[in-house]
Amino acid sequence: MSTIPENLKYADSHEWVLDNGDGTVTVGITDHAQDLLGDVVYVELPEVGTEVTATEQFSLVESVKAASDIYAPVNGEVIEVNDALNDAPELINEAPFEGAWIAKIKLSNAADLDKLLDAAGYSATIA
């Protein structure tokens, strides 16, 4: 059974979103997604300064099984990326909700968060 923290929001494309409370969010992929992918061997990080659009591809995760596009769950600008994933992509498997965030995004519109699923809603999509 996948871990689904209650304090996060979720996209049905398996990204999690942490509202940092300052107009920014932290984004990663869910435990369910990393489990489906298997051992992650590479993460293509977005460029800082990139404008992202909700539901459009902004990153890529490659595993021993497959390559999977990662979709922006909100509209905004990438303000920071997790460079630790360049040297340790396996963090996605080991700690998908802690050390393995992919990017921090400055929201264009805070209302985007209202369009995301809560933990119960996400749990229902993967049941």
UniProtKB/Swiss-Prot annotation:
Gene Ontology biological process: glycine decarboxylation via glycine cleavage system
Keywords (A to Z) from UniProt: Lipoyl
Occurrences of domain Lipoyl-binding (ranges): 24-106
InterPro entries attached to this UniProt entry: 2-oxoA_DH_lipoyl-BS, Biotin_lipoyl, GCV_H, GCV_H/Fam206, GCV_H_sub, Single_hybrid_motif
Modified residues (N6-lipoyllysine): K65
Superkingdom classification of source: Bacteria
GO (cellular component) term, any one: glycine cleavage complex
Pfam families listed in its UniProt record: GCV_H
Needed co-factor(s): (R)-lipoate
Cofactor, how bound (note): Binds 1 lipoyl cofactor covalently.
Record text on subunit structure and interactions: The glycine cleavage system is composed of four proteins: P, T, L and H.
Function: The glycine cleavage system catalyzes the degradation of glycine. The H protein shuttles the methylamine group of glycine from the P protein to the T protein.
Family as reported in the entry's similarity comment: Belongs to the GcvH family.
Full protein name: Glycine cleavage system H protein
Annotated organism of origin: Marinomonas sp. (strain MWYL1)
Organism lineage: Bacteria, Pseudomonadati, Pseudomonadota, Gammaproteobacteria, Oceanospirillales
